[in-house]
A protein has these predicted regions:
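Short beta-strand scaffold segments in enzyme catalytic cores
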Residues: 257-262, 308-312
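Active-site histidine-anchored catalytic micro-motif
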Residues: 2-248, 266, 275
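Basic nucleic-acid-binding interfaces
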Residues: 267-448
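Low-complexity, intrinsically disordered Gly/Pro/Thr-rich segments
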Residues: 236-249, 418-430
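Conserved hydrophobic/aromatic beta-strand scaffold that supports enzyme active sites
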Residues: 140, 152, 257-259, 281, ...
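Short glycine/threonine-rich loop-to-helix capping motif typified by GTGT followed
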Residues: 191-194, 251, 369-373
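Conserved, well-ordered active-site substructure
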Residues: 197, 246-261
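Active-site lining segments that contact anionic ligands and/or coordinate catalytic metals
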Residues: 175, 233, 254-259, 359-361, ...
């Protein structure tokens, strides 16, 4: 029978009820205004570990960076400081899985066995039993990654080199994500905490490896990780920072929070290069149908999940447009399939012919994840819309339609934009927009 570490702080640091937890994750992740679509994802995150009421928004900003990692990251190496049980070195559990209200996460016993070959890595279920620093990250990871295995380390008294050695051993490839759990300064007055934390953020961004526990409670795992990251020449990006006085606490004694994303060299693909590749995939897919087999185009970043629209024009007029609103296929596959559908299966147009093909031009739009809009009434909805930036999905009574941001070029009035979108969805002219579900997204587009 499998042994499972039960969730220790569900109901305290985050909701114990699965439905309530999912709703809170929706709120935290949905509260990040629809970001631009991402190509690639971080190798590592640094995230805080207080209750979601306090540090949840800062943590969510980091986990939002994993939007393209689902289906690629299969293992998470998670390190955080011990708060309850003293440990010499790094402690790993012996149980088979960690539980959260969202389900069980299997442990990667091969990875943990490899780490235990090092003399400073010990087995201790007790060190993990009540530890919150690791547990609070798990629901975010489950939401963003889906299925993955976990290699958790409760870090006690260890040197920079000892922590770095463990991280190096489990570094892996794109299938492995490293997460470091740490808060910043503790129990300082608000102004003093801001001063201390600003200096600490600068030191983290410069890969300092001598942070102390007054600067970051997780200084021990963080220092070791920064040493490994510096050796591998990762780039680092500060995503968010605040303290409990900015969220749900008073300003007399506060705790600081920050989140960082770190990228391996070459992981952040240039938009220009990505656009050339996606347009080439779209054109090759259509030409393969028109003229025969074409050479396949592949790259690791094309295997991430992606949602795209492919638009065909001829002599400046629309010739076909088909796309995906959710990232359910690999990016390369999604572009190719949508290109074929736009050329041959758009019901508004006849199939593209070889004779007209030389005059057809392509546009590929890469969509961010759609975020639900929250509004009090129709006027509030209209006030929030951003012409030229927002792609909009309108849903009501089982009907749905979308307009890409490009449509603002021809319909620049907000109310008319939504009315035309409702009409596209097959809704009556008098439908009350405030009763519709409205989501928005952003796109990055490339045109031949």
């Amino acid at each position: 029978m499998a042994s499972v570490r039960a969730a220790a702080v569900a109901g305290m640091f985050y909701p114990a009820d699965p439905r309530s937890l999912n709703a809170e994750l929706d709120e935290l992740l949905g509260g990040i205004d629809a970001p631009a679509p991402r190509l690639g994802f971080p190798k590592a995150l640094v995230v805080p570990h207080a209750g979601y009421l306090y540090s949840g928004p800062v943590a969510a900003r980091a986990f939002e960076e994993l939007g393209a990692a689902r289906g690629i990251v299969r293992r998470v190496v998670l390190l955080g400081p011990v708060h309850r049980v003293p440990v010499r070195g790094l402690a790993v559990p012996t149980v088979d899985a960690f539980a959260t209200p969202l389900g069980n996460i299997a442990l990667d016993h091969a990875a943990l066995a490899s780490a235990r070959e090092l003399p400073h890595v010990v087995a201790s279920d007790l060190a993990h039993l009540q530890e919150h620093a690791l547990e609070v990250q798990l629901p975010f990871l489950q939401r963003q990654l889906g299925e993955f295995s976990l290699a958790p380390f409760a870090v006690g008294d260890a040197t920079v080199a000892e922590v770095a050695q463990v991280i190096e051993r489990l570094w892996g490839g794109p299938e492995t994500l490293i997460v470091i759990s740490t808060d910043l300064s503790h129990y300082q007055p608000y102004a003093r905490a801001c001063e201390i934390d600003r200096a600490t953020l600068t030191r983290i961004a410069s890969f300092a490896t001598n942070l102390d526990h007054h600067e970051a409670c997780g200084a021990t795992p963080l220092n070791g990780f920064l040493a490994a990251a510096r050796e591998r020449r990762l780039s680092i990006k500060l995503l968010a920072a605040c303290n409990s006085g900015d969220t749900a606490g008073g300003k007399g004694q506060v705790v600081g929070y920050s989140s960082f994303a770190l990228y391996e060299p070459g992981a952040e693909l240039s938009l220009e290069e990505a656009g050339r590749t996606l347009l080439a995939i779209a054109r090759a897919a259509i030409e393969a149908r028109l003229f025969g087999a074409a050479q396949a185009i592949d790259a690791p970043w094309l295997r991430q999940a992606g949602a795209t629209f492919v638009t065909l024009t001829r002599d400046g007029a629309l010739r076909g447009c088909i796309g995906s609103l959710q990232a359910e296929r690999s990016l390369g596959t999604d572009v190719a399939e949508n290109a074929i559908a736009a050329a041959f299966r758009d019901p508004r147009f006849p199939a593209v012919t070889p004779a007209e093909w030389p005059g057809v031009r392509l546009e590929v739009s890469l969509l961010s994840a759609a975020k639900p809009m929250r509004f009090a009434d129709e006027e509030d909805l209209l006030a929030q819309l951003r012409p030229g930036e927002d792609g909009v999905i309108l849903e009501h009574e089982g009907r749905r339609a979308t307009y890409l941001p490009q449509v603002w070029e021809s319909i620049n009035d907000k109310r008319q934009f939504l009315r035309e979108l409702a009409r596209k969805a097959g809704l009556p002219d008098g439908v009350r927009l405030a009763r519709c579900t409205i989501l928005r997204y952003r796109v990055t587009k490339w045109t031949e």
